[in-house]
UniProtKB/Swiss-Prot annotation:
GO terms for biological process: phospholipid biosynthetic process. Pathway: Lipid metabolism; phospholipid metabolism. Its EC number is 2.3.1.275. This is Glycerol-3-phosphate acyltransferase. It is an enzyme of class 2 (transferase). One of its GO terms (molecular function) is acyl-phosphate glycerol-3-phosphate acyltransferase activity. The lineage of its organism: Bacteria, Pseudomonadati, Pseudomonadota, Betaproteobacteria, Nitrosomonadales.
Amino acid sequence: MITVILIFSAYLLGSISFAVVASWLFKLPDPRSYGSGNPGATNVLRTGKKVAAAVTLLGDAGKGWVAVVVAKYLGNVLGLGDEVIASAALAVFLGHLFPIFLAFKGGKGVATSAGILLGLNLWLGILAILTWIIVALVSRISSLSALLSALLAPLYTYFLLQKEMLTITVLIISILLILKHQSNIANLIAGKETRIGKSS
């Protein structure tokens, strides 16, 4: 029962769109109505409001981190296995991608996945974030940074954690993230992908 409650709570937490919340707080247009239409930090940044984008980034990453850390704590206290952590990680990620509060039309999960990785292991999260930053500095393309980080995240997880269940979980999250970036992949191939800080 505790596991079911944890999974459901993680999904509801993931369903909170901080892009929409931040836009409301800073009196900005709904992030689904401009730019890429994606309720995420990169799209909010297109308004020029860096603080709103930062709130979105921290909120979306934070919910992923909280879900995993709470699952790890309960797992230790109750003697539960990695399955609980994996389930919470997937639930919060799916909540972000398919939020019940936004008619199941959510973001692409980049910040939330970063929070999940940080929750699983600090160095794992840092390594994935550094990958994103390096690619972003070179290319100035957010989606390319996210895609390369997603491709490498399962490998980082395997070598750092040495846990099959969590590696598979991160692999699933990476696959879902990549699938959410299909339009970005098409734009990258066509050389039309928008660069960071510019309107689409």
